[in-house]
Amino acid sequence: MLSGLTARYTKTSSGYMGQLLEWPEVITEGVDIEDCRQSLEDAAREMVLAYRQQNKEIPVEHSLFETIMVEMA
């Protein structure tokens, strides 16, 4: 079964950092966004396996995210 998780990518001095918003423990880095995305997908798969082995509940998407506009100047 496929489940959607929300990835957040942040530009760093060495490339990109990726994190799953629903599963904050899953954090990766990559030299570019594609590398970071692949690492994040791999890390998520590994975490699913680890959580299943430990009989832990796997986080699922239950949130709504939206952008709000705020005047900054």
Residue ranges and their predicted role:
Residues 22-24, 55:
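Conserved acidic functional residues
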Residues 5, 16, 26-28:
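Structural detector for hydrophobic anchor residues on beta-strands
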Residues 1-6, 38-73:
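Short, charged, surface-exposed hinge/linker loops at domain edges
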Residues 13, 31, 38-39:
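An amphipathic alpha-helix/helix-turn recognition signal
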Residues 24-35:
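A short, exposed loop/beta-hairpin motif centered on an aromatic-Gly-Thr core
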Residues 11-14, 26, 51:
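Short glycine- and Lys/Arg-enriched binding-loop motifs that mark or flank ligand-binding interfaces
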Residues 9-21:
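Short aromatic-glycine-(Arg/Gly/Cys) micro-motifs in beta-strand/loop hairpins
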